[in-house]
């Protein structure tokens, strides 16, 4: 790879600091042995420290559009804290505590300042992808004793409603990012070891029994693998559709993973056919049309509610009485928190990253951003720390290594 040799490998000290920063951002994987409140305190401290360290880089004037978009997303997020104070009476401190995880994006400016080598970044991606698998297996071995993952009430709960033990905690996006990296490396280097790793990562993704993550990961995989052969691409799409249709005629045990997930999907489709609006459509309509108090909050956002404030209790009441959840609608949450300004910035970032030209060796960064563009429709993945760090790495790689756009070239994803 012929890249500008401005990048350097992380030193041992930097590796220690970056791993600590990541684990803190992940809130120690919400380990059940720690107090739910205490594990959040380091996050509130490390974000400002990272911000101060990167301040000169943050205010640096550059014409790079990706850099500018990341900067303005951070600015719009900070503005939303004050919006919640002015229009909802939520204190600045509670506003910051509610949205601190959303400021993990400042990691991008550390990367831009330090310019670590691609080798360091890819090693980092593999480390946290593998670490999630190890922790997940450990949590499985301890079932039914809960190990990782607090719910919104500060309690740990495993779900067995989908045909197998469903243990989900922060780090799933790190797993998906590592999968895309493995897949990309296999198709570039043709080393079977990366194919084996990619298959293992995908099996772990399936074992998360989260339909949307499986769907969008598989879709991006199909597009990437068959991008150069349109016939195979179309056949693959037809195969996926046929598999979905056959799912209604093939009988699976209701206790099996496949049977349970098909049943859940069919129940949702049945509700739609009976005239019952899909819950996420209802949520999107509500949060886009009924949440904001005035035109100003429509533009700059309302900020993120904290459970201890009256603003947060308003959201809790909505969840309990109408079963409408802000975390269910990624773009709805972006609009509520940062308004039309933030929504425009995020969409511009996602779309630009999906259309940008990248070297074949770094295509995993683009694969992840395409995945995120679609996955964020039905969940607020963009606001999760693991997703934000993966975003930072992907956008950083695109900022530094993007190829020049070709004139009169047909637009393609890969």
Where are these regions (language model features)?
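Hydrophobic transmembrane helix bundles of membrane-integrated enzymes that assemble
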Residues: 1-264, 320-413
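Luminal/periplasmic active-site loops of membrane-embedded glycosylation enzymes
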Residues: 155-162, 172, 266-280, 295
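Long extracytoplasmic/lumenal interhelical loops at the membrane interface
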Residues: 274-338
């Amino acid at each position: 790879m012929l890249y500008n040799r401005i990048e350097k490998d992380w030193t041992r000290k930097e590796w220690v600091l970056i791993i600590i920063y990541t684990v803190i951002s992940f809130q120690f994987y919400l380990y059940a042995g720690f107090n739910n409140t205490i594990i959040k305190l380091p996050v509130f401290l490390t974000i400002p420290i990272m911000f101060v360290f990167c301040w000169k880089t943050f205010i640096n004037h550059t014409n790079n559009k990706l850099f500018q978009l990341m900067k303005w997303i951070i600015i719009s997020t900070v503005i939303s804290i004050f919006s919640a104070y002015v229009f909802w009476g939520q204190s600045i401190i509670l506003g910051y505590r509610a949205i601190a995880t959303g400021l993990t994006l400042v990691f991008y400016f550390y990367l831009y300042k330090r310019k670590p080598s691609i080798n360091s970044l890819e090693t980092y991606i593999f480390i946290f992808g593998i670490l999630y698998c190890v922790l997940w297996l450990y949590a499985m071995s301890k079932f039914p004793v809960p190990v990782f993952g607090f719910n919104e009430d500060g309690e740990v709960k495993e779900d067995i409603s989908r045909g197998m033990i469903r243990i989900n905690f922060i780090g799933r996006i790190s797993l998906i990012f590592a999968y895309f990296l493995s897949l990309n490396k296999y198709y570039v280097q043709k080393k079977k070891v990366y194919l084996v790793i990619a298959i293992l990562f995908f099996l772990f993704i399936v074992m998360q029994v989260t339909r949307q993550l499986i769907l969008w990961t598989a879709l991006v995989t199909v597009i990437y693998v068959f991008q150069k052969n349109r016939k195979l691409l179309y056949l693959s799409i037809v195969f996926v559709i046929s598999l979905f249709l056959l799912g209604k005629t093939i009988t699976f045990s209701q206790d099996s993973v496949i049977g349970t997930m098909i049943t859940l999907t069919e129940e949702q489709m049945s509700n739609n056919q009976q005239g019952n609006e899909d819950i996420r459509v209802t949520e999107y309509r509500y949060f886009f049309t009924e949440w904001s108090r005035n035109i100003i909050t429509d533009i700059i956002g309302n900020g993120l509610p904290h459970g201890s404030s009256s603003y947060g209790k308003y959201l809790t009441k909505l969840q309990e009485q109408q079963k409408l959840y802000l975390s269910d609608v990624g773009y709805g949450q972006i609009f509520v928190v940062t308004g039309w300004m933030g929504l425009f910035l995020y969409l511009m970032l996602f779309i630009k990253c999906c259309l940008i030209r990248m070297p074949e060796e770094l295509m995993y960064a683009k694969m992840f951003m395409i995945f995120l563009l679609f996955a964020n429709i039905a969940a607020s993945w963009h606001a999760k720390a693991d997703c934000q760090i993966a975003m930072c790495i992907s956008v950083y790689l695109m900022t530094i290594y993007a190829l020049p756009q070709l004139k009169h070239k047909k637009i393609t994803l890969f």
